[in-house]
């Protein structure tokens, strides 16, 4: 049994219709027992129906408010918009104490509308938020699933609400082996054991060589996912690799001399691969952007002509998808110069020329109609 006897609970998160992962929490019942017990019981649903006629249970509720570089907020299981919720003690209960501070990311704290108005709504910090000290009660922390929190934090929002529902599909209390293993980081389906964001990395201190090693592994995880037909996951791994590389854009003075060209080459490959997979997902704007990034570092990466040709081709595919056929044709001409015998480039060039011809014919027909 783990030394800590603090309660541990979990949320299984669903984004849209996609099962996303689990967030595990440890609750500080030794500091704020009443507040911790409220959250624990709302995870299990053991208190039954509330005074508002809704189950006292987080299951099925959503994260209704997300502000990047601040926090993600949920717990309104009555109105689902931040105006509702109910504690196990009644609608509201007093602030227990402000002993714990908002001094780091991944803390659990009570949302409120002023002093003594705690209900069921909570938030998870994603950065230190000292301006909330003395106003909101900290009562727990995330011990696993930080990548899930970051995924929610980085979702598109409108008026601070995620544009796709982020739902607590299941929740409860962890016991036995589940309790003991709750804080252990486990690899995902690709074998990736790393946190999604370098700021959350634990273990070996990050340095340029370490980040290069991690990014190289992530490239391989992405390749595996792509080969297995999971294009979205492959793209996630390539982008994650770039996040780790970006922690140290350049090697430091005492790093190996051959590290810099290796880092630049890996950056080129990750951008190029990202463009390929974005295009396959129909994300043509991203496909164009990432191909452009690859070309921006191609010289520094000493990229081979064949690899440059691939990137020009991938940018052309993205531009064609964006109906930017003239730009696509220019990139295909560059690609053809670098790889004159490439059949895919020739086929795409013919297709784009046909599209341009059809567009010009349509424009002429429209002009004739306008002036007739």
Curated annotation (Swiss-Prot):
Enzyme class label: isomerase
Principal location: cytoplasm
UniProt-annotated stretches for the region Disordered: 174-193
Swiss-Prot/TrEMBL catalytic activity: [protein]-peptidylproline (omega=180) = [protein]-peptidylproline (omega=0)
Swiss-Prot/TrEMBL keywords: Cytoplasm, Isomerase, Repeat, Rotamase, TPR repeat
One MF annotation (Gene Ontology) recorded for this entry: ribosome binding
Lineage: superkingdom: Eukaryota
Role, per record: PPIases accelerate the folding of proteins. It catalyzes the cis-trans isomerization of proline imidic peptide bonds in oligopeptides.
Recorded family membership: Belongs to the cyclophilin-type PPIase family. PPIase D subfamily.
Protein's name in the database: Peptidyl-prolyl cis-trans isomerase D
Lineage start: Eukaryota, Fungi, Dikarya, Ascomycota, Pezizomycotina
Gene expressing this chain: cpr6
């Amino acid at each position: 049994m783990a030394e800590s006897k603090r309660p541990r609970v979990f949320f299984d998160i669903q984004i849209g219709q996609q099962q996303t992962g689990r967030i595990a929490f440890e609750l500080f019942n030794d500091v704020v027992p009443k507040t911790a017990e409220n959250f624990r019981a709302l995870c299990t649903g053991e208190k039954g129906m509330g005074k508002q006629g809704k189950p006292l249970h987080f299951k099925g509720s959503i994260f209704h408010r997300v502000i990047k570089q601040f926090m993600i907020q949920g717990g309104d299981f009555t109105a689902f918009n931040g105006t509702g919720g109910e504690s196990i003690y009644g609608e509201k209960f007093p602030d227990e104490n402000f002993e714990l501070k908002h001094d780091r990311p991944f803390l659990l704290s009570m949302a409120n509308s002023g002093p003594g108005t705690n209900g069921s709504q909570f938030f998870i910090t994603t950065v230190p938020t000292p301006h909330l000290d003395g106003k909101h009660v900290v009562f727990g922390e995330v011990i696993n699933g930080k990548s899930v929190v970051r995924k929610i934090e980085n979702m598109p929002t409108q008026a601070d609400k995620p544009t796709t529902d982020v739902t607590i599909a299941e929740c409860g209390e962890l016991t036995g082996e589940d309790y003991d293993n709750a804080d252990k980081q486990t690899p995902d389906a690709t074998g990736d054991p790393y946190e999604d964001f370098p700021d959350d990395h634990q273990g070996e201190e990050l340095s340029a060589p370490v980040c290069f090693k991690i990014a190289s592994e992530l490239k391989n995880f992405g390749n595996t996912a792509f080969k297995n037909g999971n294009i979205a996951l492959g793209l996630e791994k390539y982008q994650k690799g770039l996040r780790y590389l970006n922690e140290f854009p350049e090697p430091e003075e005492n790093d190996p001399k051959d590290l810099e060209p290796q880092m630049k080459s890996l950056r080129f490959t990750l951008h190029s691969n990202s463009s390929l997979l974005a295009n396959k997902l129909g994300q043509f704007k991203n496909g164009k952007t990432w191909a452009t990034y690859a070309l921006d570092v191609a010289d520094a990466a000493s990229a081979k002509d064949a690899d440059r040709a691939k990137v020009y081709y991938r940018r052309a595919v993205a531009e064609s998808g964006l109906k930017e056929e003239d730009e696509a044709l220019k990139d295909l001409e560059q690609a053809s110069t670098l790889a004159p015998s490439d059949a895919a480039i020739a086929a795409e060039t013919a297709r784009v020329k046909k599209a341009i011809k059809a567009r010009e014919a349509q424009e002429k027909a429209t002009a004739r109609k306008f002036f007739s």
